[in-house]
């Protein structure tokens, strides 16, 4: 049962919301969110796995957050955000509940590393984005130390991994940039837990 999985439960949601409201965490998170906001296109954005809504709350008007935890969805809706309960597996990652032609960008932050079948998931989501008319996709994954810090992580995504899995070009999108943040050097992630890899894809005609 989904309700028995911690990530779907009320305790997990409460902890995510508590952490998102901590003053120091908010200050640090703003630094990271500012960087993401500079990577997306102006206009409505789809935030896949929106969690506690830190990014969703700063996205352009008309943006939508998709989240598997119903308690987080309820909390975000109470804050006036367009958060929607979404079971990606039952929908085969097709984003079928979203209307084509409304969204410019798609973000997926600290989600891809949780899948065993990440290449297949990316191809399905990127294909869905193409159907919706999305022009920019930003995928964010942890560096080495961040990846190792969570036992639920299944796939370690690096620049080399993207290349080796044939994902430099994916479902009509070309990888424009693959940069590490806050320092663009992969080895920083060996000791700094908050190091990230940002993959920026653009739609090609």
Feature names for model-found ranges:
Residues 54-57, 145-149:
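Short catalytic/ligand-binding loop motif for oxyanion handling, primarily in non-cytosolic enzymes
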Residues 16, 141-145:
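Short, histidine-centered active-site or binding-site loop motifs used for metal coordination
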Residues 110-114:
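Short catalytic micro-motifs in class I SAM-dependent methyltransferases
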Residues 115-119:
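A structural helix-start
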Residues 120-134:
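A short glycine-rich, Lys/Arg-flanked "PGG" loop and its adjoining helix->strand segment in the class I
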Residues 1-101, 105, 109, 122, ...:
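Conserved N-terminal segment of class I S-adenosyl-L-methionine
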Residues 132-142:
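Conserved beta-strand signature within the Rossmann-like core of class I S-adenosyl-L-methionine
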Residues 146-165:
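Acceptor-substrate binding/catalytic loop of class I
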